[in-house]
Amino acid sequence: MRTRMTSTPLDKIRNFSIVAHIDHGKSTLSDRLIQTTGGLTAREMSAQVLDNMDIEKERGITIKAQTVRLTYKAADGETYILNLMDTPGHVDFAYEVSRSLAACEGSILVVDASQGVEAQTLANVYQAIDNNHEIVPVLNKVDLPAADVDRVKAQIEDVIGLDASDAVECSAKTGVGIPEVLEAIVTRLPPPKGDPNAPLKALLVDAWYDAYLGVVVLVRIFDGSLKAGQQVRMMQTGATHRIDKVGVFTPKATDVEYLGPGEVGFFTASIKEVADAAVGDTITDEKKPTAEALKGFKEVVPVVFCGLFPVDAADFEDLRAAVGKLRLNDASFTYEMESSAALGFGFRCGFLGLLHLEIIQERLSREFDLDLIATAPSVVYKIKLRNGDEIELHNPADLPDVMQIEEIAEPWIKATIFTPDDYLGGVIKLCQDRRGMQRELSYVGSRAMVVYDLPLNEVVFDFYDRLKSISKGYASFDYQLEDYRAGDLVKMSILVNSEPVDALSMLVHRSRAESRGRGMCEKMKELIPQHMFVIPIQAAIGGRIIARETVRALRKDVTAKCYGGDASRKKKLLEKQKEGKKRMRQFGKVEIPQEAFIAALKMDED
């Protein structure tokens, strides 16, 4: 349905995003704004309209950026178009956040009036400031008994440096203060700029796969206009497409004739998969292209890798189809086939971070009903060889011969941790144990902010879980990748009955190898059932064994049938048994149960 012919004047448009830490009420506030402006009827309102995936609703996080166009009649009698960009709050999706922010001129900073400023609030606000946003602070959840408005205002001023004296107070749950939020958007945020007669210049904010339409592309128009039938070109990938239809979300998809400068909408153009529509790309007219692309485009590079294998080898084809489907909708997820002697065929997958990895795993098991084993997550190492070559290592099992290696460099991150000061000692000890280097420590009221440099390898295992348990769930954590630094890293192999198990090999720092190896061996000993022969379980670095546990043999009483009689007869039978065991150990195969793999890979260090 075509709803309008003329483009909205620029001074009547406001493009804004909502920035907040997880659980500070961002999605609930979006729901209230949609409801108040009449975007959906009361019957169509479902809680968290913009979080489409079940996982998004259950975990209370926003994964994909969403957008909605609201029509608002302001106090001055004018009607404004408000484009709300709902951004993911989690650090793994920082690039999606940066593109959503680049499509807006202002941000609403939502802070929970009972919790105060958290680590991700900080990370996202800094991104908004980098994009020259006008920022309106909003204190949410003021209806809670624990809300302390003055303390949180002081915190916003101390930590972020924003003037919070005229912060809007509201409660998205009860609807108090929502009209004030809408007025603040209209009066305090700037309108977009743009030239309708210039060549088309649009930012590709996001893209997702729709079973009927193919890839749906979300765009923000800066100059020119976009309409059906137009031939457009993606400036980074060079691909050209003919536009099938153009529309806006109100939040229902509504077709329009064209999109003008300052507007946010979507188009479809029979694009086959999301990887062909790179987030952050500039879209222009093929016949009359714009001179230069918009700044800030980055190739999305996976940071964490792990192997995914089906528990039942017969499910491999289903897994192949499932990862292919997820890739359609998530260009930052990469995969390639991998085979392991212990686990059979599977895929080596790349993710943006740990939350991304968890979500993909959960979606595979939930939406595609697959039982999976995930190998230990590893990061990308850069290896300098003696012959001067540099290679990237995604899988520890593929490490070249030690004699060829000059040095191994690992990625380091800058981690910002907010914690109540009661738990500060435990948090600092955790960071020190993980080879962290303290950068700064400051106090904001009764909360401490610690900044550490940490190797990503030490964080991907279970850092986040440990941080939460040390701080009783109160600490919040955020990180950015810094650089690669050379380290004393060694490859640790686990041998069962003198055979290396490829799925359990990992790169560890030499200082941590022994404790990690001992823990792995103890775990495996508990879980490998007894066989008829002795099974040694060893952790080795190169040819040196650093830890060993032994699974004792089952023993059959071969002398039971000798009643009394000669001792040499018993001796002969025992010797014969010993010989048989020796031969058995040489040729016997050790069956390692799947539970042993899963438990060893989930090993929690103490």
UniProtKB/Swiss-Prot annotation:
Q: Write down the species.
A: Caulobacter vibrioides (strain ATCC 19089 / CIP 103742 / CB 15) (Caulobacter crescentus)
Arranged from A to Z, the UniProt key words for this protein are: Cell inner membrane, Cell membrane, GTP-binding, Hydrolase, Membrane, Nucleotide-binding, Protein biosynthesis
- Function recorded in the entry: Required for accurate and efficient protein synthesis under certain stress conditions. May act as a fidelity factor of the translation reaction, by catalyzing a one-codon backward translocation of tRNAs on improperly translocated ribosomes. Back-translocation proceeds from a post-translocation (POST) complex to a pre-translocation (PRE) complex, thus giving elongation factor G a second chance to translocate the tRNAs correctly. Binds to ribosomes in a GTP-dependent manner.
Give the UniProt record's GO annotations in the biological process aspect.
positive regulation of translation
The primary location reported for this protein is: membrane
Its topology with respect to the membrane? Peripheral membrane protein
> InterPro entries annotated for this entry?
EF-4 (IPR006297), EFG_III/V (IPR035647), EFG_V-like (IPR000640), EFTu-like_2 (IPR004161), G_TR_CS (IPR031157), LepA_C_sf (IPR038363), LepA_CTD (IPR013842), LepA_IV (IPR035654)
Q: Which reaction does it catalyse?
A: GTP + H2O = GDP + phosphate + H(+)
What GO cellular component entries does it have? Answer: plasma membrane
Matching entries from HAMAP family are given as: LepA
Stored CDD domains? EF4_II (cd03699), EF4_III (cd16260), LepA (cd01890), lepA_C (cd03709)
Instruction: Identify this protein by name.
Output: Elongation factor 4
List locations, semicolon-separated: Cell inner membrane
Which residues belong to any copy of the tr-type G domain?
Answer: 11-193
Recorded E.C. number(s)? 3.6.5.n1
Does the keyword Cell inner membrane belong to this entry? yes
Q: Where does GTP bind?
A: 23-28, 140-143
Would you identify the family this protein belongs to, as annotated?
Belongs to the TRAFAC class translation factor GTPase superfamily. Classic translation factor GTPase family. LepA subfamily.
- For the protein in the UniProt heading, the enzyme class is hydrolase
Q: Which GO terms describe its molecular function?
A: GTP binding; GTPase activity; guanosine tetraphosphate binding; ribosome binding; translation elongation factor activity
Q: Which SMART domains match?
A: EFG_C
Question: SUPFAM superfamilies under this entry?
Answer: EF-G C-terminal domain-like (SSF54980), P-loop containing nucleoside triphosphate hydrolases (SSF52540)
